From Swiss-Prot:
Residues 1-18 form a propeptide. The lineage of its organism: Eukaryota, Metazoa, Chordata, Craniata, Vertebrata. One of its GO terms (biological process) is immune system process. The 26S proteasome consists of a 20S proteasome core and two 19S regulatory subunits. The 20S proteasome core is composed of 28 subunits that are arranged in four stacked rings, resulting in a barrel-shaped structure. The two end rings are each formed by seven alpha subunits, and the two central rings are each formed by seven beta subunits. The catalytic chamber with the active sites is on the inside of the barrel. Component of the immunoproteasome, where it displaces the equivalent housekeeping subunit PSMB6. Autocleaved. The resulting N-terminal Thr residue of the mature subunit is responsible for the nucleophile proteolytic activity. It is found in: Cytoplasm; Nucleus. This is Proteasome subunit beta type-9. The active site is at T19 (nucleophile). It holds the Pfam family Proteasome. The gene is psmb9-a. It comes from the Eukaryota.
Length: 217
């Protein structure tokens, strides 16, 4: 008699974004980028998840950690920013969005496993990038996160330059993601980019076979 088959192990694993995420400021805006692989244990459960989540018209966040936790935080902040913008009659500031993410992350630090990079543009501060890890709130010229970040810290430190143009920042993000995706087993799929400036947000998806390649020399 055949024994009843047990459910696959990945069904009981927490779904995590794995992830490489990055954001960088340029004069007049920001560029965010992420890979698209989502894993549960050793199983890839989604190859094309967009980890760049809209918080408001000109504010996005990049998600890493538990997929459910990160998406929940993003949805909570999106709702609160919508209410806030209606109450004050103007678009929210990027720092306000980052502060909301920081407060939620810290309040539920024992229950949640997520790291969000918040970036966007507002008329008071221009392009801004904020790190919100474990209740920290820090503005940085650029930030990287996720499991793939360990493979690219040397690259970004060597390649980053002050006062980079929008096009240079876009290429910097693409190169960083491509390198991380080729090294980190938890990062992969396609690369998502969002460029935000005074005019609004422009989203772009770059297929895996269109990414630059990095080979060991």
């Amino acid at each position: 008699m055949l024994e009843e088959s047990s459910e696959p192990g990945w069904l009981s694993e927490e779904v995590k974004t794995g992830t490489t995420i990055i954001a960088i400021e340029f004069d007049g805006g920001v560029v965010l980028g992420s890979d698209s692989r989502v894993s549960a244990g050793e199983t890839v459960v989604n190859r094309v998840m967009n980890k760049l989540s809209l918080l408001h018209d000109k504010i996005y966040c990049a998600l890493s950690g538990s997929a459910a936790d990160a998406q929940t935080i993003a949805e909570m902040v999106n709702y609160q920013l919508d209410v806030h913008s209606i109450e004050v009659g103007e678009d929210p500031q990027v720092r306000s969005a980052a502060t909301l993410v920081k407060n939620i992350s810290y309040k539920y630090k024992e229950e949640l496993s997520a790291h969000l990079i918040v970036a966007g543009w507002d008329k008071r501060g221009g392009g801004q990038v904020y790190v919100t890890l474990n209740g920290l709130l820090s503005r940085q010229p650029f930030a990287v996160g996720g499991s793939g970040s360990a493979y690219v810290y040397g690259f970004v430190d060597a390649e980053y330059r002050k006062a980079m143009s929008k096009e240079d920042c876009q290429q910097f993000v693409v190169n960083t993601l491509s390198l991380a995706m080729s090294r980190d087993g938890s990062s992969g799929g396609v690369a998502y980019l969002v460029t935000i400036d005074e005019k609004g947000a422009e989203e772009k998806c770059i297929l895996g076979n269109e990414l630059p390649t990095f080979y060991d020399q």
